[in-house]
Amino acid sequence: MLKIGLVGCGAIASLITKALMSDRLNKAEVLAFYDGNLEKAEKLAMETGADFCKSLDELVSKDLDLIVECASVNAVEDTVIKSLNNDKDVIIMSVGAFADKDLFVKLYKLAEKLGKKIYVPSGAVAGIDAVKSGSLGKISEVSLTTTKPVHGLKSALEEQGLNTDEIKEPKIVFEGTVFDAISKFPQNINVSVVLSLASRYPAKVKIIADPNAVVNRHEILVKGSIGTIKTCVENNPCRDNPKTSALAAYSVIRLIKDLSEPVRIGT
């Protein structure tokens, strides 16, 4: 049995927990929760019969195998360091934090030193396995075009001074580097960092806000010595958190299952 603790108790954490509780194989179980909003953690713990932790230190000190971060980019550094130092592997959902190269190298070296693992799920895009394999050759171009409903980008756009009520047709709201993209859209474009890490090449990112869109659309283009990789995924937004896709949560659940099962399919 893989014993799991969750950091962050929002919509994604709830999806992960329910999926593992309904798994007939029952090879992984969430045993403890922590959230900066203690009421959220307590509520989810009461619903599942798991432990409610009042601090991250309390969570990582428990008898757990794996910590899953599904909180925010600001929670990543502390979560990873404390998890690794307490002999636990960790899954990072808020992979946008790794756009900070210095932080990525710091955590990479700590995991290497302690003999532990940091896992980054594929998230809401397809083809990451092919991109990882292709990165062993020479990559010459990586781009991501993401189209989302306006309401899914609302908070990030309004923070930049844009009036979302004035967007009446598809509008390019960002075009630039992966580093600038994750800085301006920290809750919306984690997939750009996953793509950049997998390809070992900084992705060019375009974000389109579409008032008529009902899905989150991610188009990937990778060119290199292996040829050309093109993928397009149209994801249903997470029902309780339209900033992200349901597939992002499912990719974490699939990763947890892979870690708990004897056979793993895919790169």
Curated annotation (Swiss-Prot):
User: What residues make up the catalytic site?
Assistant: 218
Instruction: Please give the pathway this protein is involved in.
Output: Cofactor biosynthesis; NAD(+) biosynthesis; iminoaspartate from L-aspartate (dehydrogenase route): step 1/1
Q: Which UniProt keywords apply?
A: NAD, NADP, Oxidoreductase, Pyridine nucleotide biosynthesis
Q: Name one Pfam family in it.
A: NAD_binding_3
MF GO annotations: aspartate dehydrogenase activity; NAD binding; NADP binding; oxidoreductase activity, acting on the CH-NH2 group of donors, NAD or NADP as acceptor
Q: What is its EC number?
A: 1.4.1.21
Top-level taxon in the UniProt lineage = Archaea
Any GO BP: NAD biosynthetic process
Task: Identify the residues that bind NAD(+).
Answer: 124, 190
What catalytic activity does the UniProt entry give for this protein?
L-aspartate + NADP(+) + H2O = oxaloacetate + NH4(+) + NADPH + H(+); L-aspartate + NAD(+) + H2O = oxaloacetate + NH4(+) + NADH + H(+)
Q: Which PANTHER family match?
A: ASPARTATE DEHYDROGENASE DOMAIN-CONTAINING PROTEIN, L-ASPARTATE DEHYDROGENASE-RELATED
Any other noteworthy remark? The iminoaspartate product is unstable in aqueous solution and can decompose to oxaloacetate and ammonia.
Which family does the record assign? Belongs to the L-aspartate dehydrogenase family.
State the protein's purpose.
Specifically catalyzes the NAD or NADP-dependent dehydrogenation of L-aspartate to iminoaspartate.
Q: What is this protein called?
A: L-aspartate dehydrogenase
Q: Which organism is it from?
A: Methanococcus maripaludis (strain DSM 14266 / JCM 13030 / NBRC 101832 / S2 / LL)
Q: Which gene encodes it?
A: nadX
